[in-house]
Amino acid sequence: MATVNQLVRKPRAPKVDKTNVPALNACPQKRGVCTRVYTTTPKKPNSALRKVARVRLTNGFEVTSYIGGEGHNLQEHSVILIRGGRVKDLPGVRYHTVRGALDCAGVSERRQGRSKYGAKRPKS
């Protein structure tokens, strides 16, 4: 235990917590331009072709963003919105593309969980 005199000389340092999404600069979302849209394979027990995009953000960061949902219309130079949220089986992918915002279309024919994929309510 430090003495009062020691604490006067050198106060206790606050704990600094590390962010999982440094490129967002404490913002909920960020806009960026796709520099490359491609597929990649997940880590060991899983097998698939996951759709991802390399994105140059407005703050200068270049990050990899996962494109969720079935099918997408993204290509190079598409302007997209990204949010935080990692993909556990893709190392280095710490961001998600927001579907239905800017140049990224929502998932067509989506019936359930529509808000997460930018799909409008279907006509009954």
Curated annotation (Swiss-Prot):
Signal peptide: none annotated. It holds the Pfam family Ribosom_S12_S23. The keyword Phosphoprotein does not apply. This is Small ribosomal subunit protein uS12. It comes from the Bacteria. It comes from Shewanella woodyi (strain ATCC 51908 / MS32). The gene is rpsL. Part of the 30S ribosomal subunit. Contacts proteins S8 and S17. May interact with IF1 in the 30S initiation complex. One of its GO terms (molecular function) is structural constituent of ribosome. The keyword Ribonucleoprotein applies. With S4 and S5 plays an important role in translational accuracy. GO terms for biological process: translation. Keywords: Methylation, Ribonucleoprotein, Ribosomal protein, RNA-binding, rRNA-binding, tRNA-binding.
